[in-house]
Amino acid sequence: MSASEEMLGGARGESTTATGPFSFSSEPTLEDIRRLHAEFAAERDWEQFHQPRNLLLALVGEVGELAELFQWKPDEEPGPQAWSPRERAALQEELSDILIYLVALAARCRVDLPQAVLCKMDTNRRRYPVHLSRGSACKYTDLPHGATSENQAMGPADPASESTGQVST
């Protein structure tokens, strides 16, 4: 069975609508993807076209192609898990294109994506404390109990303000 057949539900068309939690395969890593794409581009002498602006525009174009797959689908539809094999293959291709361009853009901009994700998740944990955000779609600036800015949602930045109870601005 090829990797693409496995990702689409197997060579015999097994269902991909498992009800349990989903997890990604451990390989390839983001570094593997960066290297594979860099080799692919180098073999074709395409690095000259891979300036950040061009990579970003290609990424946005691929996001548009992904959006087209969802466009005009009814909201009550079960979702991509119930799509035809052809639609699922298109979904897989567009998501792959997006990841490839995202990794290439990050590499070109010298952003270590795994580390950036860890930092961003830490920021999000501070912005969206569980007790204020559980079940809410509110932006952190709109959370209840006076959390009206990132600094307030994350807590006081000035240690002196902790003793007075005032948040510095």
Curated annotation (Swiss-Prot):
Q: Which residues cross the membrane?
A: none
State where composition is biased (Polar residues).
14-26
Q: Which SUPFAM superfamilies match?
A: all-alpha NTP pyrophosphatases
Q: Where is this region: Disordered?
A: 1-26, 143-169
Specify the domain of life of the species encoding this protein.
Eukaryota
Q: Would the keyword Cytoplasm be found if you checked this record's keyword annotation?
A: yes
Please state what the protein is called: dCTP pyrophosphatase 1
